[in-house]
Swiss-Prot record:
This is Feruloyl esterase A. Belongs to the AB hydrolase superfamily. FaeA family. Glycosylated. Glycans are attached at N100. Optimum pH is 5.0. Inhibited by the specific serine esterase inhibitor diisopropylfluorophosphate. The keyword Signal applies. Its EC number is 3.1.1.73. GO terms for biological process: cell wall macromolecule catabolic process; cellulose catabolic process; lipid metabolic process; pectin catabolic process; xylan catabolic process. The gene is faeA. Optimum temperature is 55-60 degrees Celsius.
Length: 281
């Protein structure tokens, strides 16, 4: 599988014309470490949260047998946050959700005007909505000064996006970190997320959409089927580092999506050197 180096990325962006103005190379070490921490949790979700950071307390499991949606409620008393994480695709049942591209009204969030979301992931969301909202409410009531963080990889990333959208209608302090996220909804949904999560600037955003090299999943479902991405994109190229992370705030096809990757490839399963469920970090 072809890997994209930082040098190659710079050459590519240098030829991207106007898109280059909306892409900058390098992020702070603090932000980079934060992205790696959330990626660790998201990748560990494939293996029952193996090797998660020592400060994190594992809480209640989220699960629905019909959709095979898996997740957990976690807590970190050091960073003062309640974390909801969703596992990515782990079964044929999940794959059926992945391939249901029918855009569906986001009826559980009427504030999201004209919003339509990925049909399969919406089925996944409504299958666990009651569990998620109940468990988050319990934790938020017990720890009212804690931030709410939602994260996940692949299918788990889109589940995280729908969950964060729903929680943002009730709570003010919701943050979203996704890794290899498919397009989760239409332009109205992307616009709602951008407004709700202050995506107008990397300095204010609370929606960190992390991509890697030529990961093919962010190119799905196709934009010409009515789908769009939200969030500020943080594009990691190899060798991964804070300096080799690009901040992409313009056209969504300028960074990862411009590499032409399609579907599950090496760049999708591995983020910051961590492979989904491998637990070798």
């Amino acid at each position: 599988m072809k890997q994209f180096s930082a040098k190659y990325a710079l050459i590519l962006l240098a030829t991207a014309g106007q898109a280059l103005a909306a892409s900058t190379q390098g992020i702070s070490e603090d932000l980079y470490n934060r992205l790696v921490e959330m990626a660790t949790i998201s990748q560990a979700a494939y293996a029952d949260l193996c090797n998660i950071p020592s400060t994190i307390i594992k809480g209640e499991k989220i699960y629905n047998a019909q959709t095979d949606i898996n997740g957990w409620i976690l807590r970190d008393d050091t960073s003062k946050e309640i974390i909801t994480v969703f596992r990515g695709t782990g079964s044929d049942t999940n794959l059926q959700l992945d391939t249901n591209y029918t855009l569906t009204p986001f009826d559980t969030l009427p504030q999201c005007n004209d919003c339509e979301v990925h049909g399969g992931y919406y089925i996944g969301w409504i299958s666990v909505q009651d569990q998620v909202e109940s468990l988050v409410k319990q934790q938020a009531s017990q720890y009212p000064d804690y931030a709410l963080t939602v994260t996940g990889h692949s299918l788990g990333a889109s589940m995280a996006a729908l969950t964060a959208a729903q929680l943002s209608a009730t709570y003010d302090n919701v943050r979203l970190y996704t890794f290899g996220e498919p397009r989760s909804g239409n332009q109205a949904f992307a616009s709602y997320m951008n407004d709700a999560f202050q995506v107008s600037s990397p300095e204010t955003t609370q929606y960190f959409r992390v991509t890697h090299s030529n990961d093919g999943i962010p190119n799905l479902p196709p934009a010409d089927e009515g789908y769009a991405h939200g969030g500020v994109e943080y594009w990691s190229v190899d060798p991964y580092s804070a300096q080799n992370t690009f901040v992409c705030t313009g056209d969504e096809v300028q960074c990862c999506e411009a590499q032409g990757g399609q579907g599950v490839n090496d760049a999708h399963t591995t983020y910051f050197g961590m492979t989904s469920g491998a637990c070798t970090w």
